[in-house]
Amino acid sequence: MGNASSIVQTINVTGDGNVFKPSAETSSTAVPSLSLSPGMLNPGGVPWIAVGDETSVTSPGALRRMTSKDIPETAIINTDNSSGAVPSESALVPYIDEPLVVVTEHAITNFTKAEMALEFNREFLDKMRVLSVSPKYSDLLTYVDCYVGVSARQALNNFQKQVPVITPTRQTMYVDSIQAALKALEKWEIDLRVAQTLLPTNVPIGEVSCPMQSVVKLLDDQLPDDSLIRRYPKEAAVALAKRNGGIQWMDVSEGTVMNEAVNAVAASALAPSASAPPLEEKSKLTEQAMDLVTAAEPEIIASLAPVPAPVFAIPPKPADYNVRTLRIDEATWLRMIPKSMNTPFQIQVTDNTGTNWHLNLRGGTRVVNLDQIAPMRFVLDLGGKSYKETSWDPNGKKVGFIVFQSKIPFELWTAASQIGQATVVNYVQLYAEDSSFTAQSIIATTSLAYNYEPEQLNKTDPEMNYYLLATFIDSAAITPTNMTQPDVWDALLTMSPLSAGEVTVKGAVVSEVVPADLIGSYTPESLNASLPNDAARCMIDRASKIAEAIKIDDDAGPDEYSPNSVPIQGQLAISQLETGYGVRIFNPKGILSKIASRAMQAFIGDPSTIITQAAPVLSDKNNWIALAQGVKTSLRTKSLSAGVKTAVSKLSSSESIQNWTQGFLDKVSAHFPAPKPDCPTSGDSGESSNRRVKRDSYAGVVKRGYTR
């Protein structure tokens, strides 16, 4: 019949002898994540078997996919594939003819970990009568000898023995059972985490302690009334002990205290040593830095050869402008009527409903040249602006977006007759209130929006120009002397690209980009006036990932060399030896090291310095290429080490947190003192009268047991 053993442990949550002594080596962990990405779980391939008695599986049609009917019934009900909780798998899933799939070792490992995650809460699940039988993924697997591959062509050269396979129905039912249990644990898990964070239950280094009875009193005083820990204190005590080796309960029957944590392996990786940060932390940080560099694509952003615009482009990001403050010669996508044109002229336009609107144009009026804009969303916010004049109050007035088309360039307009066609594409009514300052009226937040798509304008005439204006409009004529503003661009204009693959360079749409040529090619003004999808902004976004990776990996200070700054130093050392014009200055290695370090630090602080002409070192494309490639090499050749300063700083910081934690726990024990040995632990009228909720004196006693 086999042997059976029973383990029974009796604990008292509110009694003596329990231990609360968190340490870095017993950090609390559960199973916060699993590696279940499709690329890791699939494809394991599918099983194939030979058709009939074919002598060669290379013959056409010699292999076919295996189904559940190809598995002997003895294999399905074999006790080797059963947990013993049910007589056979047929009691759980229907035995129907289904195709089989091969299960990878990675999938088996992670589903097993999912089962372990549930068992952290076994006592609570039993109390709820949920998942009374522990799931076991291996029970649903059958091991067969077969050809393995995604296709028959691949499988014919890949015969394997003892291959784990499963049917889709069984796989779905297994995952559903896991999900059902996790659903039942949602509030329970939250309440457990609340209990573990209400007071410090972990310490980054060393060890701290507090009387367990004081800890229990604090939890009893502060936990929400609907906390499941109040209703199930026994089950909570066991669940916490499994997660945290610093929480230990005394076996009342045996008089012993045992560490029941099941996370010793993870806890050791999370704990720092006497001179280094935790191994897990160093691994994660290096992984993050490498991921950032990979996302930046150093080969692309340092390329001296043309790169197609869709490849170089990044997901579009909105950009904000005040059109009135941009220089026309820098923002080449803007046009302006010369200020010397002193005679305002009025025009009348319609909207899509046929309503007539009046507006004025004058010297200084600005428009967006839509011929130089990719599909774009415009949102104009006049919030906080005044626009009030002696005879012009913006409150109740309307502002609109107007699209013009004309064969005459906008900067040459002097009369309404020069305009081909125009229409109001959107408008909003303003709300404004008097400002605290005299003669000003502050406009509330507005959202005047327009989505520009070239297809809407039916651009068939290459000589036709298209412009977008934002200005006041009215159903009646606007007297030029009353409203003297040239437009309403003195506001916050947010431009958001509607397409991801188009790139512009200084206002011109391009099909390809030479990334290295962007280095040092912009002035601060032209960069500020560049469109959201400008190649310079794409470069800065990618370069920012390089800067962030350096910051994660590098703890060198100003003027200190590091593996990430010396690529610049190497380039500087060679460039000063090259034949050039003017006086040649030879700097020793100490000076070159400082120059390279300062350039790297400036880049980390503001990655846009590589684009602007003001940067003395990294505005040279050769130095930029050296940095981008050098950082990748530096990270790839790094082991699980940490910077000297980082290690010292983290350890000293951890010690300060340890001291703070112990100080907090000392306050807990002072304000929630444990009863003296000669005093009753519970049930005493004097003690219970001060408690928020009166407890059953036996509520903290639990007998846990299982039979195997």
Swiss-Prot record:
This is Outer capsid protein mu-1. One of its GO terms (biological process) is symbiont entry into host cell via permeabilization of host membrane. It comes from Reovirus type 3 (strain Dearing) (T3D). It holds the Pfam family Reovirus_M2. A lipid is attached at residue 2 (N-myristoyl glycine). InterPro entries: Mu1/VP4 (IPR009113), Mu1/VP4_sf (IPR036256), Mu1_membr_pen_domI (IPR015961), Mu1_membr_pen_domII (IPR015962), Mu1_membr_pen_domIII (IPR044937), Mu1_membr_pen_domIV (IPR015960). The gene is M2. Cleaved during the endosomal proteolytic disassembly of the outer capsid. Mu-1 is proteolytically cleaved into mu-1N and mu-1C during the maturation step to generate the ISVP. Cleavage of mu-1 to mu-1C is dependent on myristoylation and binding to sigma-3 protein. Mu-1C is further cleaved into delta (59 kDa), and phi (13 kDa) segments during entry into the host cell cytoplasm. Mu-1 and mu-1N are N-terminally myristoylated. This acylation is essential for the membrane fusion activity. Heterohexamer of three sigma-3 and three Mu-1 proteins. Changing residue 2 to A: Complete loss of myristoylation and binding to sigma-3 protein. The C-terminal region, phi, determines both targeting to intracellular membranes and induction of apoptosis. Belongs to the orthoreovirus mu-1 protein family. GO terms for cellular component: host cell endoplasmic reticulum; host cell mitochondrion; host cell plasma membrane; membrane; viral outer capsid.
